[in-house]
Curated annotation (Swiss-Prot):
It is found in: Cytoplasm; Nucleus. A zinc finger (C2H2-type) spans 2-24, 29-52, 154-177, 193-215. Residues 226-248 are annotated as: MIU. This is Zinc finger-containing ubiquitin peptidase 1. It is an enzyme of class 3 (hydrolase). The motif interacting with ubiquitin (MIU) and ZUFSP ubiquitin-binding domain (zUBD, also called ZUFSP helical arm ZHA) are responsible for binding the distal (outgoing) ubiquitin units S1 and S2 respectively. C2H2-type zinc finger 4 is a ubiquitin-binding zinc finger (UBZ) and required for polyubiquitin binding, possibly binding the proximal ubiqutin, and for catalytic activity. C2H2-type zinc fingers 1-3 are required for localization to sites of DNA damage. Belongs to the peptidase C78 family. ZUFSP subfamily. The keyword Zinc applies. The modification N6-acetyllysine is found at residue 262. One of its GO terms (molecular function) is zinc ion binding. The record marks 487 as: Involved in the stabilization of negative charge on the oxyanion by the formation of the oxyanion hole. The gene is ZUP1. Interacts with RPA1 and RPA2.
Length: 578
């Protein structure tokens, strides 16, 4: 079923609806002179030509004026003078069709604006009509009498007032609406005013101004609504942005906390205990797994407590005599080696259950110190010392901080090492040796100096360090130089020598605290196999970390030199190569 939007009547099909709408259209056709309605368009044309011949002549004049104003003659039949001023949908549509400049814009949604547009047009037409009647004064009385006798009293096109005679209507219009008739229409060359917003053409500037004011009022209302909507949208967008920022900050904070906790665990600063707690915990695990008898557990625990009490390493992870064994090996074998330089005597220390995963720096310091304790040149500064246990080394570093060494490094580790599993590196080894009056310095190989990320400058520096003694010596040179502390990201080792092969390639000899005693014991055999040295030899292709730092010992310090170096450590610097 289809429903008519005009009268509400329902019909069954689309053709019926079209026929129904045609009836509406015919009923809406009104004679502009006598208000006759209810006839077809052709009948209305015949009626106007016969009954209103003189008035129709005036209408044709109006159409010619409209043609001049709007530059078109396509819609002449819609420009009929609407004296009745009946504002309905069909009349408004006819008004819009008179303005081909922008017909779509003329039909605004606001009904007030439509009425003003129609009023403006009919105002102009009415002025022309009244002016023509003044010029044709000889016919005025005749026309008036014919109009009044045949079609009834005339109605004012401006206010709708009805007068009995046309002369009275003219008097009413000239007196009451004189302000609307102040423009002469003697010719068609009068100035025209285009509406800048919809294109409507007006002959009166004041009417155009009123018409534009209606546009502005409508636009102001729409803009106000837009501002309200825009303000709401901006507020919502701001709230969404704030929520997104809050979630992002929360996620970043959570990730930072997790990363910080991870770093704390990695570097032993998570308050999970130190050497003693880890040793006991790991021994208990061994007992629970059946790998250690309870009696062995108690014996080791007693030995550990005694070692911690006196601050001396119990020597259970130490392997001695390796330098001597290497000397014999290179003398009797290693035919591919042209020359080899070995450090002074040094013991190997490996990690235990108490420091596994974090104690490499402490074990390398034990190796370096074991060499210094066997060197007479350091008797004065290391008098009466033994190789300390790891907790004792932590205490010694804290004492160096208290003396004023490396305040920045102390701050990074919260001025505390005892009872933690905190890692130590080249800086801590340097300040510890300096506090003991051992002269040393740090060299930083901060980037690779060879192809494929290799460090040939590092190898050259170590070769110069060891070969500075005994130039032109035999194949095996046992120098008096202490071993070198070698640090890289995540691990540290001890360089105990360097060999030069017959093809002039260099290979470092390195003690790794991660290598257990049973492997190091293989080097003490009388007939050492070349494969046993594989764990010691490190070629240039084996050292490809981005950065390496070394701590090299150069002798003993006087008390004055120690004070000067303590002052220099306030802003820690190292020699950089390259």
């Amino acid at each position: 079923m289809l429903s008519c939007d005009i009268c509400g009547e329902t019909v069954t099909s689309e053709p019926d609806m079209k026929a129904h709408l045609i009836v509406h259209m015919e009923n809406e056709i009104v004679c502009p002179f006598c208000k006759l309605s209810g006839v077809s368009y052709d009948e209305m044309c015949f009626h106007i030509e016969t009954a209103h011949f003189e008035q129709n002549t005036l209408e044709r004049n109006f159409e010619r004026i409209n043609t001049v104003q709007f530059g078109t003659s396509d819609n002449k039949k819609d420009n009929t003078l609407q004296c009745g001023m009946e504002v309905n949908s069909s009349i408004l549509s006819g008004c819009a069709s008179n303005h081909p400049k922008n017909s779509s814009q003329c039909l605004t949604k606001d009904s007030t604006l439509k009425h003003e547009t129609f009023y403006s047009e009919n105002l102009t037409e009415s002025r022309k009509f009244l002016k023509s009647r003044e010029k044709q004064s000889g016919l005025t009385e005749v026309k008036g009498s014919i109009y009044e006798t045949t079609y009834g009293p005339p109605e004012c096109p401006f206010c709708g007032k009805i007068e009995e005679h046309s002369e009275d209507m003219e008097t009413h219009v000239k007196t009451t609406h004189a302000n609307l008739l102040d423009i002469s229409l003697e010719d068609c060359d009068q100035p025209l005013y285009d509406c800048p917003m919809c294109g409507l053409i007006c002959t009166n500037y004041h009417i155009l101004q009123e018409h534009v004011d209606l546009h502005l009022e409508e636009n102001s209302f729409c803009q106000g609504m837009d501002r309200v909507q825009c303000s709401g949208d901006l507020q919502l967008a701001h709230q969404l942005q704030q929520e997104e920022d809050r979630k992002r900050r929360s996620e970043e904070s959570r990730q930072e906390i997790e990363e910080f906790q991870k770093l704390q665990r990695q570097y032993g600063l998570d308050n999970s205990g130190g050497y003693k707690q880890q040793q006991l915990r790991n021994m208990e695990i061994e007992v629970n797994r059946g790998r250690m008898p309870p009696s062995e557990f108690h014996r080791r625990k007693a030995d550990m407590m005694e070692s911690l009490a006196i601050g001396i390493d119990d020597g259970k992870t130490k392997t001695s005599g390796i330098i001597e064994a290497l000397h014999r090996y290179y003398q009797n074998a290693a035919t591919d080696v042209r020359q080899v330089w070995l450090s002074s005597v040094v013991d190997h220390f490996h990690s235990s259950l108490g420091d596994k995963g974090w104690g490499c720096g402490y074990r390398n310091f034990q190796m370096l110190l074991s060499s210094l304790l066997q060197n007479d040149a350091y008797d004065d500064c290391l008098k009466g010392m033994s190789v300390p246990c790891i907790p004792k080394i932590q205490s010694m570093i804290e004492d160096a901080w208290k003396e004023g060494f490396d305040p920045q490094g102390a701050s990074q580790l919260n001025n505390r090492l005892q009872g933690t599993k905190a890692w130590i590196g080249a800086c801590e080894v340097y300040i510890l040796l300096t506090s003991l009056r051992v002269k040393c310095h740090i060299v930083d190989f901060h980037k690779s100096t060879g192809p494929l990320g290799t460090h040939p400058r590092l190898f050259e520096w170590i070769l110069n360090y060891y070969s500075s003694e005994g130039e032109g010596s035999p194949k095996v040179v046992c120098t008096s130089k202490p071993p070198i502390y070698l640090q890289h990201q995540g691990h540290s080792r001890t360089v105990i020598g360097i060999e030069e092969k017959k093809n002039r390639t260099l290979c470092l000899l390195i003690f790794d605290p991660g290598c257990p005693s049973r492997e190091m014991q293989k080097l003490l055999k009388q007939d050492v196999e070349a494969s046993s040295l594989k764990q010691l030899r490190k070629s240039m292709g084996n050292l490809k970390h981005k950065q390496y730092q070394i701590v090299a010992v150069e002798g003993a310090l006087s008390p004055e030199e120690k004070v000067a170096r303590r002052q220099d450590s306030q802003v820690f610097t190292a020699e950089k190569i390259p």
